[in-house]
Protein backbone atom coordinates (compact mmCIF):
# COMPACT_ATOMS: atom_id res chain seq x y z
CA UNK A 1 0.00 0.00 0.00
CA UNK A 2 1.37 3.42 -1.00
CA UNK A 3 0.46 6.22 1.38
CA UNK A 4 0.19 9.93 0.73
CA UNK A 5 2.94 10.99 3.15
CA UNK A 6 2.33 14.65 2.37
CA UNK A 7 -1.26 14.28 3.54
CA UNK A 8 -0.19 12.57 6.77
CA UNK A 9 2.38 15.34 7.31
CA UNK A 10 -0.32 17.97 6.83
CA UNK A 11 -2.61 16.22 9.32
CA UNK A 12 0.22 15.82 11.85
CA UNK A 13 1.21 19.50 11.67
CA UNK A 14 -2.40 20.62 11.96
CA UNK A 15 -2.94 18.55 15.12
CA UNK A 16 0.54 18.81 16.69
CA UNK A 17 0.75 22.55 16.06
CA UNK A 18 3.72 22.97 18.42
CA UNK A 19 5.60 19.85 17.26
CA UNK A 20 5.89 20.15 13.49
CA UNK A 21 7.50 17.53 11.25
CA UNK A 22 8.51 17.39 7.59
CA UNK A 23 7.72 14.83 4.91
CA UNK A 24 11.35 13.76 5.19
CA UNK A 25 10.97 13.20 8.94
CA UNK A 26 8.02 10.86 8.46
CA UNK A 27 9.74 8.96 5.67
CA UNK A 28 13.07 8.47 7.45
CA UNK A 29 11.68 7.75 10.91
CA UNK A 30 8.55 5.78 10.02
CA UNK A 31 7.67 4.77 6.47
CA UNK A 32 11.19 3.99 5.18
CA UNK A 33 12.87 2.95 8.43
CA UNK A 34 14.32 -0.58 8.44
CA UNK A 35 13.53 -1.03 12.14
CA UNK A 36 9.84 -0.12 11.74
CA UNK A 37 7.04 -2.21 10.21
CA UNK A 38 4.12 0.23 9.76
CA UNK A 39 0.48 -0.74 9.99
CA UNK A 40 -1.28 0.74 6.97
CA UNK A 41 -3.38 2.68 6.36
CA UNK A 42 -2.09 5.20 8.88
CA UNK A 43 -4.79 7.76 8.12
CA UNK A 44 -8.47 7.77 7.27
CA UNK A 45 -11.07 10.53 7.04
CA UNK A 46 -9.89 13.26 9.46
CA UNK A 47 -7.58 11.12 11.62
CA UNK A 48 -4.09 9.64 11.52
CA UNK A 49 -2.23 7.09 13.66
CA UNK A 50 1.38 6.02 13.10
CA UNK A 51 1.11 2.45 14.38
CA UNK A 52 3.89 -0.09 13.94
CA UNK A 53 5.59 -3.24 15.11
CA UNK A 54 9.31 -3.98 15.00
CA UNK A 55 10.84 -4.36 11.55
CA UNK A 56 14.43 -5.59 11.43
CA UNK A 57 15.84 -6.53 14.86
CA UNK A 58 17.28 -3.51 16.65
CA UNK A 59 20.78 -4.59 17.68
CA UNK A 60 20.57 -6.55 20.94
CA UNK A 61 17.16 -5.22 22.08
CA UNK A 62 15.40 -8.39 23.27
CA UNK A 63 12.38 -7.33 25.35
CA UNK A 64 10.10 -6.53 22.41
CA UNK A 65 8.22 -9.72 21.59
CA UNK A 66 4.49 -9.11 21.52
CA UNK A 67 4.87 -5.32 21.64
CA UNK A 68 3.58 -2.66 19.26
CA UNK A 69 3.67 1.11 19.24
CA UNK A 70 1.71 4.17 18.19
CA UNK A 71 4.23 6.95 17.58
CA UNK A 72 1.80 9.76 16.98
CA UNK A 73 -1.96 10.13 16.47
CA UNK A 74 -4.49 12.90 16.10
CA UNK A 75 -7.66 14.11 14.43
CA UNK A 76 -9.00 17.34 12.99
CA UNK A 77 -12.77 17.11 13.32
CA UNK A 78 -14.30 13.94 14.70
CA UNK A 79 -12.68 12.00 17.53
CA UNK A 80 -14.74 9.06 16.30
CA UNK A 81 -12.57 8.93 13.17
CA UNK A 82 -9.47 8.34 15.31
CA UNK A 83 -11.22 5.73 17.45
CA UNK A 84 -12.32 3.82 14.35
CA UNK A 85 -8.85 3.99 12.77
CA UNK A 86 -7.02 2.75 15.87
CA UNK A 87 -9.57 0.00 16.50
CA UNK A 88 -8.86 -1.20 12.95
CA UNK A 89 -5.13 -1.09 13.71
CA UNK A 90 -5.74 -3.18 16.84
CA UNK A 91 -7.03 -5.93 14.55
CA UNK A 92 -3.77 -5.91 12.59
CA UNK A 93 -1.74 -5.87 15.81
CA UNK A 94 -3.62 -8.99 16.90
CA UNK A 95 -2.90 -10.66 13.54
CA UNK A 96 0.79 -9.95 14.16
CA UNK A 97 0.45 -11.62 17.59
CA UNK A 98 1.01 -8.33 19.39
CA UNK A 99 -0.82 -8.18 22.71
CA UNK A 100 0.48 -4.90 24.15
CA UNK A 101 0.41 -1.56 22.35
CA UNK A 102 2.23 1.49 23.70
CA UNK A 103 1.68 5.12 22.88
CA UNK A 104 5.34 5.98 23.18
CA UNK A 105 8.51 6.31 21.17
CA UNK A 106 9.92 3.22 19.44
CA UNK A 107 13.71 3.19 19.32
CA UNK A 108 15.43 4.47 17.29
CA UNK A 109 12.38 6.23 15.80
CA UNK A 110 11.66 9.24 17.98
CA UNK A 111 9.01 11.91 17.59
CA UNK A 112 7.75 12.54 21.14
CA UNK A 113 8.18 10.41 24.27
CA UNK A 114 4.43 10.00 24.77
CA UNK A 115 1.31 12.15 25.10
CA UNK A 116 1.82 15.76 26.18
CA UNK A 117 -1.51 15.92 28.00
CA UNK A 118 -1.06 19.62 28.79
CA UNK A 119 -0.81 20.62 25.11
CA UNK A 120 -2.97 17.88 23.60
CA UNK A 121 -5.52 16.78 26.24
CA UNK A 122 -7.97 15.62 23.58
CA UNK A 123 -5.52 12.92 22.46
CA UNK A 124 -5.22 11.49 25.96
CA UNK A 125 -9.01 11.44 26.29
CA UNK A 126 -9.31 9.52 23.01
CA UNK A 127 -6.71 6.96 24.11
CA UNK A 128 -8.45 6.48 27.46
CA UNK A 129 -11.69 5.85 25.58
CA UNK A 130 -9.86 3.16 23.57
CA UNK A 131 -8.83 1.43 26.80
CA UNK A 132 -5.28 2.74 27.14
CA UNK A 133 -3.98 3.23 30.67
CA UNK A 134 -1.26 5.59 31.86
CA UNK A 135 1.82 3.62 32.93
CA UNK A 136 4.51 6.27 33.35
CA UNK A 137 5.11 10.01 33.33
CA UNK A 138 8.41 11.23 31.88
CA UNK A 139 10.03 14.65 31.96
CA UNK A 140 11.73 16.83 29.35
CA UNK A 141 14.27 19.43 30.48
CA UNK A 142 16.36 22.16 28.90
CA UNK A 143 19.08 24.65 29.81
CA UNK A 144 20.13 27.95 28.27
CA UNK A 145 23.74 27.05 29.17
CA UNK A 146 24.16 30.49 30.72
CA UNK A 147 24.46 29.25 34.31
CA UNK A 148 27.87 29.09 35.95
CA UNK A 149 29.22 25.56 36.11
CA UNK A 150 29.33 24.33 39.74
CA UNK A 151 32.68 23.33 41.16
CA UNK A 152 33.18 19.66 42.04
CA UNK A 153 35.97 18.09 44.02
CA UNK A 154 38.40 15.79 42.18
CA UNK A 155 37.94 12.06 42.70
CA UNK A 156 41.06 10.01 43.31
CA UNK A 157 41.87 7.72 40.41
CA UNK A 158 39.22 9.32 38.18
CA UNK A 159 39.87 10.78 34.74
CA UNK A 160 37.12 12.45 32.70
CA UNK A 161 37.65 13.84 29.19
CA UNK A 162 36.53 13.64 25.58
CA UNK A 163 36.63 10.14 24.12
CA UNK A 164 40.02 8.97 22.85
CA UNK A 165 40.33 7.31 19.45
CA UNK A 166 41.99 4.30 21.06
CA UNK A 167 39.03 3.58 23.38
CA UNK A 168 36.05 3.88 21.01
CA UNK A 169 35.61 0.11 20.70
CA UNK A 170 35.96 -0.30 24.47
CA UNK A 171 33.29 2.36 24.99
CA UNK A 172 30.85 0.58 22.67
CA UNK A 173 31.49 -2.68 24.51
CA UNK A 174 30.86 -0.89 27.82
CA UNK A 175 27.57 0.55 26.54
CA UNK A 176 26.51 -2.79 25.06
CA UNK A 177 27.08 -4.54 28.38
CA UNK A 178 25.33 -1.99 30.57
CA UNK A 179 22.80 0.13 28.68
CA UNK A 180 19.92 -0.16 26.17
CA UNK A 181 20.46 -0.87 22.48
CA UNK A 182 19.30 2.64 21.58
CA UNK A 183 22.23 4.08 23.55
CA UNK A 184 24.61 1.78 21.70
CA UNK A 185 23.16 2.79 18.32
CA UNK A 186 23.40 6.52 19.03
CA UNK A 187 26.92 6.30 20.43
CA UNK A 188 28.08 4.20 17.47
CA UNK A 189 26.82 6.76 14.95
CA UNK A 190 28.29 9.75 16.83
CA UNK A 191 31.65 8.00 17.27
CA UNK A 192 31.76 7.22 13.54
CA UNK A 193 30.46 10.52 12.15
CA UNK A 194 30.67 13.17 14.87
CA UNK A 195 33.57 14.85 16.66
CA UNK A 196 35.36 13.70 19.81
CA UNK A 197 34.07 16.62 21.93
CA UNK A 198 30.53 15.22 21.61
CA UNK A 199 31.37 12.18 23.75
CA UNK A 200 32.79 12.40 27.28
CA UNK A 201 34.16 9.32 29.03
CA UNK A 202 34.79 8.74 32.76
CA UNK A 203 37.59 6.33 33.64
CA UNK A 204 38.43 4.94 37.06
CA UNK A 205 41.90 3.43 37.23
CA UNK A 206 41.85 3.38 33.39
CA UNK A 207 38.57 1.43 33.29
CA UNK A 208 35.48 3.04 31.69
CA UNK A 209 32.77 3.58 34.31
CA UNK A 210 30.54 6.17 32.62
CA UNK A 211 29.94 8.34 29.59
CA UNK A 212 27.71 11.05 28.15
CA UNK A 213 27.17 12.64 24.75
CA UNK A 214 25.27 15.24 22.76
CA UNK A 215 24.19 15.52 19.12
CA UNK A 216 21.83 17.32 16.77
CA UNK A 217 19.27 14.63 17.57
CA UNK A 218 17.16 14.96 14.41
CA UNK A 219 17.52 15.50 10.69
CA UNK A 220 19.60 13.65 8.13
CA UNK A 221 22.82 14.29 10.07
CA UNK A 222 21.34 13.84 13.54
CA UNK A 223 24.69 12.50 14.80
CA UNK A 224 26.47 15.85 14.23
CA UNK A 225 27.17 18.33 17.03
CA UNK A 226 23.98 19.93 18.34
CA UNK A 227 21.75 20.77 21.30
CA UNK A 228 20.22 17.33 22.01
CA UNK A 229 21.76 16.22 25.31
CA UNK A 230 22.33 12.55 26.14
CA UNK A 231 22.31 9.67 26.60
CA UNK A 232 24.25 9.93 29.83
CA UNK A 233 24.98 7.05 32.20
CA UNK A 234 27.26 5.70 34.91
CA UNK A 235 27.96 2.09 35.86
CA UNK A 236 25.44 1.15 38.53
CA UNK A 237 28.10 0.19 41.07
CA UNK A 238 29.76 3.62 40.68
CA UNK A 239 26.70 5.85 41.04
CA UNK A 240 26.31 8.46 43.80
CA UNK A 241 30.08 9.02 43.80
CA UNK A 242 30.13 12.32 41.89
CA UNK A 243 31.06 10.75 38.56
CA UNK A 244 27.86 11.86 36.88
CA UNK A 245 28.51 15.47 37.90
CA UNK A 246 31.99 15.33 36.40
CA UNK A 247 30.63 13.99 33.11
CA UNK A 248 27.94 16.69 33.04
CA UNK A 249 30.47 19.45 33.68
CA UNK A 250 32.66 18.29 30.81
CA UNK A 251 29.71 17.95 28.44
CA UNK A 252 28.44 21.45 29.23
CA UNK A 253 31.93 22.91 28.81
CA UNK A 254 32.25 21.25 25.41
CA UNK A 255 28.82 22.49 24.33
CA UNK A 256 29.73 26.04 25.33
CA UNK A 257 33.08 25.76 23.56
CA UNK A 258 31.22 24.78 20.38
CA UNK A 259 29.00 27.91 20.75
CA UNK A 260 25.80 25.96 21.32
CA UNK A 261 23.06 28.14 22.80
CA UNK A 262 21.09 25.56 24.77
CA UNK A 263 20.89 21.92 25.76
CA UNK A 264 17.74 19.81 25.97
CA UNK A 265 16.62 16.23 26.38
CA UNK A 266 13.20 14.62 26.09
CA UNK A 267 13.11 11.82 28.64
CA UNK A 268 14.00 11.35 32.29
CA UNK A 269 12.08 10.55 35.46
CA UNK A 270 11.34 12.64 38.54
CA UNK A 271 14.08 10.95 40.56
CA UNK A 272 16.81 11.97 38.11
CA UNK A 273 15.82 15.62 37.75
CA UNK A 274 17.74 16.78 40.84
CA UNK A 275 21.19 16.33 39.28
CA UNK A 276 20.17 18.21 36.12
CA UNK A 277 18.67 21.08 38.11
CA UNK A 278 22.04 21.60 39.80
CA UNK A 279 23.48 22.36 36.37
CA UNK A 280 20.86 24.83 35.20
CA UNK A 281 18.31 22.50 33.59
CA UNK A 282 14.61 23.24 34.08
CA UNK A 283 11.54 21.14 33.36
CA UNK A 284 10.10 22.15 29.98
CA UNK A 285 7.39 19.53 29.37
CA UNK A 286 5.99 16.28 30.71
CA UNK A 287 4.63 13.31 28.79
CA UNK A 288 2.59 10.25 29.71
CA UNK A 289 3.39 6.79 28.38
CA UNK A 290 0.20 4.81 27.76
CA UNK A 291 -0.45 1.10 27.27
CA UNK A 292 -3.32 -0.92 25.83
CA UNK A 293 -3.51 -4.65 26.60
CA UNK A 294 -5.18 -6.46 23.71
CA UNK A 295 -4.85 -10.01 25.05
Per-segment meaning from a language model:
Residues 36-38, 136-140, 197, 284-289:
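Short hydrophobic/aromatic beta-strand or adjacent loop that forms the aromatic wall/cage
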Residues 78-156, 290-292:
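Acyl-donor-binding surface of acyltransferase catalytic domains
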Residues 48-55, 131, 136-139, 210, ...:
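A structural microfeature
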Residues 1-36, 138-139, 150-184:
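Short amphipathic alpha-helix that is part of the acyltransferase structural core
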Residues 78-95, 231-234, 240-253, 257, ...:
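Conserved acetyl-CoA-binding loop-helix of GNAT-fold acetyltransferases
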Residues 19-65, 176-236:
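A conserved beta-strand-loop-helix scaffold within acyl/acetyltransferase catalytic domains
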Residues 61-64, 68-82, 107, 231-240:
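A short, internal acetyl-CoA/4′-phosphopantetheine-binding micro-motif in the GNAT/acyltransferase core
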Residues 101-104, 229, 263-267:
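Conserved hydrophobic beta-strand within the GNAT/NAT acetyltransferase core sheet
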Amino acid sequence: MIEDVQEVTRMWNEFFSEDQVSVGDLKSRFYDNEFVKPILPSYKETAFSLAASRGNPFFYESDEEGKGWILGAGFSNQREDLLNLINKQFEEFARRKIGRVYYSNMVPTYFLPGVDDARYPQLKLALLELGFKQVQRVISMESGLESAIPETRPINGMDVSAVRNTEKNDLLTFIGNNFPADWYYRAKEVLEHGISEQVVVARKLNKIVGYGMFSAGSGKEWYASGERFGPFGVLESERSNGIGSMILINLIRNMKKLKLKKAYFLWTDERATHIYKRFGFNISRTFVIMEKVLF
